[in-house]
A protein has these predicted regions:
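Non-catalytic, usually N-terminal nucleic-acid engagement modules in DNA/RNA processing proteins
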Residues: 1-116
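Catalytic cores of enzyme domains
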Residues: 105-267
Length: 267
């Protein structure tokens, strides 16, 4: 196995951690120097895991499996996709950024907005970097959401939904379970960014420590909490779950009210 050695999983994890820690966009400009994101959580899944096929019933038939992603991305590859893998990661929002946002009731804090802007740029660049890193070792790799066939659909029942859900992929890779709000609850909390790369590189799957997709949500597992309903300024979260339409309307209004981009340098 070229350059990956006997433990390709550790090589991948170190590469992701190194990229995030050294990225210039992961730190507020001096004099503060506050980091936006903490050390990533990384998980792996077998591209042929049956759970990905089940997502077609749970999310919709339009949702792609990892094998479909690989087949569409590399049509010249005619061999079996057995042994292929999914690499998923979580980039947790730092404690400083979280604390800055806790006092806000309608608009997010400026630090939170800065972290979101830079975090999205960082995450896109990380997907590109990791795919290139793996490809240079002779394996096929593609970030699904950066592929030409990635799309976001508007559905009558659930509103906006994409054909590759990073949260569901992270769930399959053992990185967390879902809460009432629809967010993914990880060992580092729910404030995070996530992404993935699908590859022909064989990696050992991360064991899922949970048996239910809502296992870590206190509202579902013990009928307590419900803080996300109280916290949501638009009323988009209820006992029925997350209303994406209400959420998007609120976000659009807030973006007009708050000059989030002011003073945020591009990376």
């Amino acid at each position: 196995m070229p350059s990956f050695g006997e433990n390709p999983e550790e090589t991948i994890i170190r590469e992701i951690e190194k990229f995030v820690s050294e990225h210039p966009g992961n730190r507020k400009p001096e004099p503060d120097g506050i980091p936006y994101y903490d050390t990533p959580l990384v998980g792996f899944a077998d591209a042929n895991d049956n759970l990905f096929s089940e997502f077609k019933d749970i999310i919709g038939d339009f949702h792609l499996t990892p094998v479909e992603v690989l087949a569409q991305s590399f049509p010249e590859h005619t061999a079996s996709w057995d042994g292929s893998s999914v690499i998923s990661w979580i980039i947790p929002v730092s404690q400083s950024v979280r604390e800055s946002n806790r006092k806000e009731t309608r608009c997010s804090s400026k630090l939170w907005a800065d972290a979101k802007i830079h975090g999205e740029e960082l995450n896109i660049q990380l997907q590109e970097h990791l795919a290139s890193f793996i490809s240079e070792q002779g394996f096929l790799a593609i970030p699904p959401i950066l592929s030409p066939f990635f799309e976001v659909l508007q559905l009558d029942k659930v509103g906006s939904s994409s054909n590759w859900s990073e949260r569901h992929v992270a769930y399959a890779a053992g990185l967390g379970t879902f809460g009432l709000s629809g967010g993914l609850i990880t060992t580092q909390g729910i404030a995070m960014r996530c992404a993935s790369v699908v590859t022909s590189l064989k990696l050992n799957p991360t064991q899922r420590s949970y048996s239910d997709f809502r296992e870590d949500c206190l509202f579902y597992n013990s009928d307590t909490c419900g803080r996300c309903m109280e916290r949501c300024p638009s009323g988009a979260i209820s006992q029925e779950g997350h209303n994406k339409d209400l959420c998007m309307v609120h976000c659009a209004q807030v973006m007009q009210e708050c000059d989030y981009n002011a003073g945020v340098p591009s990376v």
